[in-house]
Amino acid sequence: MGRTLTSVLVVFISMAGWLGGADTGSISGILGMRDFQSRFADRYNPITNSYSYSAWRQALLTGTVNAGCLFGAMLSSPFTEAIGKKYSIAFFSGCYIIGQILLVTAVPSWVQIMVGKLFTGLTIGALSVLSPGYQSEVAPPQIRGAVVSTYQLFQTCGTLIAACINMGTHKLRKTASWRTSFGINILWGIFLMVGVLFLPESPRYLIYKGRDEEALRIMCQTAELDPESEIIQTNFNTIKSDIEMEMAGGKARWPEVFGKEVRYRTVLGFLTMLLRELIGNNYYFYYATQVFKGTGMTDIFLPAVILGAINFGTTFGALYTIDNLGRRNPLIFGAAFQSICFFIYAAVGDRKLIYKNGTSDHRAGAVMIVFSCLFLFSYCCSWGPMGWVIVGETFPIRYRSKCAAVATSGNWLGNFMVSFFTPFISNSIGFKLGYIYACINMTSAFQIFLMAKETKGLTLEEVNELYESDIKPWDSYKYVRQIESRRIHFSKEEEKREREKSKGYRGQEERFIENADGADNDDSSASSESFASAGAHSRSVFPRRSNVSEESHPTWV
């Protein structure tokens, strides 16, 4: 039951990432569709009979959704505290459907497109807080990192599928080309909204609401252990005592998010999510067409499919690295490697891609594509999914919803900055923008080294203890090793006790059998007149169930 429940949990909750990826992947291709441009672009060239967007129009069409995500992330907190993560996810999934309907029914006014993107952004931002948070609270600690990473995996899958849909619909006549792409996104919203209703609520939220029995049952299902298990009882009592201790201080207020107790973690989460976007992942998707044109490729929809496939395929690597290599090392070394990729990308693009006569160097374009793919491989194995993991597991429960909202808002602020300002900066300095991204990546590596603590394999309560301690981030792996050693010792002791109980039971059973055999021998030598009394004596050898304690014979229930 536990593995089935965890699998279902992964699929349905990670669909929240799919919604965001599908929206991003669809708009990037829709902006290039002929019918959409004829209705919503603000520039027309009669000589070439082509449409284009001004920097302001393109920035508003692509950046508005991220502005909505920024506010949506903050909206998630009051909903979580009122109705829990499960029903909040269902509610915002419905809001996503409404936003996509606004896009499908847009009239020839770009303002409705912008409003639809803003409304959709509100829901994507809220779900980006709720979904990883739900997964972190329900998943067992041994696989929590991999479970939360599936949010990013589904996000990249949604982007890839949307790019493929655009490639298939852009040749449809008139509005069907872009309305179909927007309309299919409605199906993903329905899938998540209905599916999440069949999943359990977070055990920590249930304990917070006083529903202890239901919380205990869910913990047993996900861990595949009995309620009497010492591991389950220890975890349950730890969670309950921590919640009671934190709730004794009353409901957290917004100013407390930056109070002494959690200020460090709030800043860590916000900076990690902000830098997650500023290190340049989305830059490649916004300007992939220009780079691929340098290699001689003319199909404007194919680059998005190629990069989307790489983005999706390499994210599987994170499912291994995050719970085997930990959090710190992949983030630090990933950012350093990405800095090198961006530096080479910028140098080649600035000096070699476009000649003064307007022609392109195909070899330079190929080199840039290679380092774009290497960057995406590193990003998808490190910063892509691990930012969500840090947000999901770092904060104590009393502050969790508010701190996670503030931290996730950093993600959408960074995304908005990249999508809105990149057209203006790129028009001014071209591929030199890559040098800026290279510097940001190096800054990100130092930020993780100085601030983030290793939390691989720890329960959320152990993570809280780690951040409350004076252990330096670069020494935190020692704490993890101590916890792992203690856990292994505890597991061995429990196995030893079980073996001793089993051994004691087998010894009792052997004695019962010997006594029974002795009684049978007495019966065979007894006279027929004493047979009845001998038979009665043989039955009295076996103790009655009421006379055998549960402690001495634990398998009798």
Swiss-Prot record:
Which loops or segments lie on the Cytoplasmic side of the membrane, by the record? Answer: 1-9, 80-87, 134-144, 201-266, 323-328, 385-404, 454-557
Q: What is its main location?
A: membrane
MF (Gene Ontology):
carbohydrate:proton symporter activity
**Which parts of the chain span the membrane according to its record?**
10-30, 59-79, 88-108, 113-133, 145-165, 180-200, 267-285, 302-322, 329-349, 364-384, 405-425, 433-453
The answer to keyword Transmembrane applying to this record is yes
The subcellular localization recorded is: Membrane
- Which is a Gene Ontology cellular component entry for this protein? plasma membrane
The name of this protein is High-affinity hexose transporter ght4
Tell me which species this is from.
Schizosaccharomyces pombe (strain 972 / ATCC 24843) (Fission yeast)
